[in-house]
């Protein structure tokens, strides 16, 4: 909830003082129109791999993606889908991602070994996705107008990206972004002190529905877990395994269901990891393989559920419905 509040305050403050427009102008002056979507996807992949958090990546890139969409005529939901897809790809492979840590610890394998197996599965899909985004962007010409690049207004986003890549806590990154955006806005005349406060208040208000949905979904799912519903389904999923392929399918189904119920892939991995380890040992599945399956399917499901933090965050920052973003995620997933 605190991350949602801070993200809303930062996004609106940065927008009010011109940081989003300045960053969009910078991106559009570097990349041709047909490569903008693919460029945002690659940036999201790189940032997420570097920082190990998909939510932090979405917070940093979603406003820029929406700004690019507005100037080029591409749907906002499409560009937000690009950001979410890249963020989940990087989260899946990052060495410092909590999902990678939990998956490898529960399966008893080394992170480097899991990465080698994981990337063989994920990289071809990422390449195809990047090519798909180039194809989607082929209809975007160079007829749009770009304003002058105001470097001082780009500074807050650069600081947010650099500090995130350096591994600084997401909340600290957002607080720094809010303060720096406010200072730049005051110096450049973007707003006065009351305008800064009003921007933060508006950003937090815009996140209100998102916060309520998150709290309600979390409470409902915890009630299901507390009453044994998740354990019962897991038992049913694992009771009829007959082959190695069936065991791998059960591991994938197990983590997918746990993620659907918890809307948190780390918690889902903690719950399903020990059971997946038992299945892998019984059917002699390589720990690197089982860890990769757990991490891949946890990130896959987390990235497409409309009540997950990633889609809710992207939807809140872009002022669209999570369902609108999902129709573009289907192209990737």
Where in the sequence are the language-model features?
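Conserved small/polar residues in nucleotide/adenosyl-binding loops
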Residues: 333
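Alpha-helical transmembrane segments and, especially, the helix-loop junctions at the ends
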Residues: 44-60, 76-107, 126-133, 258-271, ...
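Hydrophobic alpha-helical transmembrane segments of multi-pass integral membrane proteins
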Residues: 2-11, 32-64, 85, 237-277, ...
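Transmembrane alpha-helix boundary signature
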Residues: 11-26, 52-55, 76, 191
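Core transmembrane alpha-helical segments of multi-pass membrane transporters/permeases
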Residues: 1-21, 34-38, 46, 198-231, ...
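Short amphipathic alpha-helical coupling elements at transmembrane boundaries
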Residues: 22-32, 67, 101-105, 112-116, ...
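Membrane-interfacial loop-to-helix junctions in multi-pass transporters
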Residues: 26-42, 69-79, 148-155, 204-211, ...
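Hydrophobic transmembrane alpha-helices of multi-pass small-molecule transporters
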Residues: 1-5, 117-213
